[in-house]
């Protein structure tokens, strides 16, 4: 039935969003649904052939109610498939954007094996187009941060902190961090009273939780 594949794709996108919002592995996307996407594109191609045929045969006039109904259904099905594909791609691109910003705009291709927060990132789950997008977006942000805006922390929180010092809980081991007020060993389930600006990035990356 027309639209079934697109519905499956949207359900996959919703599951991904829910897992991300719940805090489960924000640094990893699920596998790109290439088979579903190709199936939807094939369906769109078939629908377009039907639409073109009805137009060529001039069967869409008001006297032919059946053909007119077929034409409208095919057009609406194509439009819905298009919207579902765009929504799926937009969701994944926004998550990739967040990964780049959370990791300070570094090149993922060179950082995945060296950066502790990216050690679990598997680029094979991305489509080829997504891999290219991720690489170029990371490079763009790196160039932006190293130019005239190099002295501004573009990855910082937009809202000013309400408190200078905050209590935080460690959600996963992050090793030692050195601050102006001493060295903290971030072990899972431990708690600290720290200056918010010192741990802002770790909060964004999911290592710490403000309590």
UniProtKB/Swiss-Prot annotation:
Pfam families from the xrefs?
A: PSF1_C, Sld5
Q: Which UniProt keywords apply?
A: DNA replication, Nucleus
N-terminal signal peptide: none
What protein family is recorded? Belongs to the GINS1/PSF1 family.
On whether Mitochondrion is a keyword of this UniProt record, the answer is: no
Q: Name one GO cellular component term.
A: GINS complex
Protein's gene = PSF1
Q: Which Gene Ontology BP terms does the record give?
A: DNA strand elongation involved in mitotic DNA replication
Organism per entry: Kluyveromyces lactis (strain ATCC 8585 / CBS 2359 / DSM 70799 / NBRC 1267 / NRRL Y-1140 / WM37)
Just give the chief location class.
nucleus
Give yes or no: UniProt keyword S-adenosyl-L-methionine.
no
Q: Which Gene3D superfamilies match?
A: 1.20.58.1030
Q: What is this protein called?
A: DNA replication complex GINS protein PSF1
What is said about its interaction partners and assembly?
Answer: Component of the GINS complex which is a heterotetramer of SLD5, PSF1, PSF2 and PSF3.
State the PANTHER family in the record. Answer: DNA REPLICATION COMPLEX GINS PROTEIN PSF1, PARTNER OF SLD5
UniProt subcellular location = Nucleus
Q: InterPro entries recorded for this chain?
A: GINS_A, GINS_bundle-like_dom_sf, GINS_Psf1, PSF1_C
Function, in words: The GINS complex plays an essential role in the initiation of DNA replication.
Which cystines does this chain contain?
Answer: none
């Amino acid at each position: 039935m027309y639209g079934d594949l697109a519905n499956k794709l949207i359900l996959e996108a919703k599951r991904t969003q829910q897992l991300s919002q719940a805090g489960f592995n924000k640094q990893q996307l699920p596998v790109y649904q290439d088979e579903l996407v190709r199936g939807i594109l094939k369906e769109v191609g078939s629908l377009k052939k039907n639409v073109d045929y009805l137009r060529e045969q001039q069967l869409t006039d008001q006297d032919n109610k059946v053909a007119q109904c077929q034409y409208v259904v095919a057009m609406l099905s194509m439009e819905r498939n298009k919207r579902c594909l765009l929504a799926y791609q937009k969701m994944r691109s926004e998550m990739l954007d967040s990964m780049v910003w959370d990791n300070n705009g570094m090149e993922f291709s060179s950082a995945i094996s060296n950066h502790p927060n990216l050690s679990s990132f598997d680029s094979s789950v991305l489509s080829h187009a997504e891999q290219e997008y991720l690489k170029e977006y990371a490079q763009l942000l790196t160039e932006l941060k190293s130019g005239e805006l190099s002295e501004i922390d573009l990855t910082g929180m937009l809202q000013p902190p309400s408190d200078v010092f905050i209590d935080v809980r460690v959600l996963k081991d992050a090793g030692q961090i050195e601050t102006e007020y001493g060295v903290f060993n971030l072990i899972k389930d431990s708690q600290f009273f720290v200056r918010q600006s010192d741990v802002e990035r770790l909060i964004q990356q999911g290592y710490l939780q403000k309590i």
